[in-house]
Every structure is written in structure tokens, then in C-alpha cells.
Amino acid sequence: MRILLSNDDGIHAPGIQALAKALREFAEVQVVAPDRNRSGASNSLTLESSLRTFTYPNGDIAVQMGTPTDCVFLGVNALMRPRPDVVVSGINAGPNLGDDVIYSGTVAAAMEGRHLGLPALAVSLNGHEHYETAAAVTCTLLRALAREPLRTGRILNINVPDLPLEEIKGIRVTRCGSRHPADKVIPQDDPRGNTLYWIGPPGEKLDAGPDTDFAAVDEGYVSVTPLHVDLTAHSAQDVVTRWLSSAGVNGQW
């Protein structure tokens, strides 16, 4: 199995290092990751400037100022030959649950892999300690994919409780929950009296029902959420069509 491994925390982050070590026990792994923390970069792609890479002695490649999406795009289309069999993103330091997937560079890297036609996993740890647990879970899932390919055409968003492996209760297939809107902005004055602004923490849980990713992780289960790229609200198409007609918009052209 040939694996392209990326993340959004940066190439030196403990999560990607732990995962690379575990994956290399049974697979050929090429790390292509940002040279710095790019958390929250979502699906952004660098189009107005060129990208430089740096290759470490062990073969890992850092993309200077690159986003997670840049890294996967370059990895699949230029840097890993032959092309990978699967794209893995993570291990993220902290969860990507509910609405987090909209902003997450970890999920975006996996999404780019899927967009390029490859199976893709995004892996996040609900904390900052037991990376070995998330690595073991990821290895188990990848071995399963090698034995029995999953032909859903979906991204698997995996969130792992920050627990020792023996305390994990199992795996649940879940849906994304949701958070209250984040609205905290933290102002700060710099030494010259100019105001700086920091974006605050994510909102608290809003929908954490028993079938959500939030509930699974809180209860000690690995959450596996299938995600797809199509953002069309299919159930709303007829509603919007009727609204355009009743509002008289259709008759203007």
C-alpha cells in the first residue's frame, strides 16, 4: 500500500510523526505536509504565488507556506511517483467534530485526495496525549481497506478519544453534530497602541444527539463519519423553485 500522508498542524507536529512511524511498519509512506501550522486553512489553494518544497534526509517533504490542500495536490500530482493508493491526513491535535469540518485543514487535505480520485481518511485525536491510540486505529482501518475496499466514494472523518487503546470501547458510524455559532473575538493592544484581534474558541455543542460524532467520542468510541463533497441541499431545490415562482423572480427574464 502506498500512502500519501499530510496534515494541517505542520510537518513537525507529534501527530503526523507518530502516524508516519506506525504506517511505515506495513506501507510505503510519503509525507508531504505544511512547513508550519496551517490549522483552519480549510480547502484554500495557493494560486497567486509559487510553492517551494524542502526534502528532509528521511524523504519527508515540507511545502513552504503551503496549505494542506496544496500539499495533497502536489503530492498526488507531482511528488509521489507512482501515485498513492490512499491519502491520509492527521493525526490532528484536537477533534474535528460537527461544524469543525467546514474549517478543518485536516479534513480538507482528505477532501482533496478524494477530489483527485483516491480513498481518503482524516484522523483527529480528541486531545493531545494518546497519539499512539489514534495511530493504531488508523492502521487497523487501512489494513481493513486493503483487505476489503470501501467503494462509497466518501471521505472517512475519524475522531479518536484521547484514551489508551485498551480503554477504547469500539467504533461507531456517526453523523456530524453541530455547534452553537462561535462569536468570541479577543482584542489586544500591541506595543504601539494598535488593536489586534484574535478569533476565539469554537462554539459549544448544539446538536450532540446519540448518533453524532460528539456523542461517540464523549462515550469512549471512535467516531467514523462518511463525508461527501457535494454541498447541494437537494431537499431544498423544490422549495427554492416554488419561492422563485411565487416571488415573481422567474417572470423577469
Curated annotation (Swiss-Prot):
Its EC number is 3.1.3.5, 3.1.3.6, 3.6.1.11. Keywords: Cytoplasm, Hydrolase, Metal-binding, Nucleotide-binding. The keyword Hydrolase applies. It is found in: Cytoplasm. One of its GO terms (cellular component) is cytoplasm. This is 5'/3'-nucleotidase SurE. One of its GO terms (molecular function) is exopolyphosphatase activity. HAMAP family: SurE. Nucleotidase with a broad substrate specificity as it can dephosphorylate various ribo- and deoxyribonucleoside 5'-monophosphates and ribonucleoside 3'-monophosphates with highest affinity to 3'-AMP. Also hydrolyzes polyphosphate (exopolyphosphatase activity) with the preference for short-chain-length substrates (P20-25). Might be involved in the regulation of dNTP and NTP pools, and in the turnover of 3'-mononucleotides produced by numerous intracellular RNases (T1, T2, and F) during the degradation of various RNAs. Its cofactor is a divalent metal cation. PANTHER family: 5'-NUCLEOTIDASE SURE (PTHR30457), 5'_3'-NUCLEOTIDASE SURE (PTHR30457:SF12). It is an enzyme of class 3 (hydrolase). Gene3D superfamilies: Survival protein SurE-like phosphatase/nucleotidase. Belongs to the SurE nucleotidase family. A divalent metal cation binds at residues 8-9, 39, 92. Its main location: cytoplasm. Binds 1 divalent metal cation per subunit. It catalyses: a ribonucleoside 5'-phosphate + H2O = a ribonucleoside + phosphate; a ribonucleoside 3'-phosphate + H2O = a ribonucleoside + phosphate; [phosphate](n) + H2O = [phosphate](n-1) + phosphate + H(+).
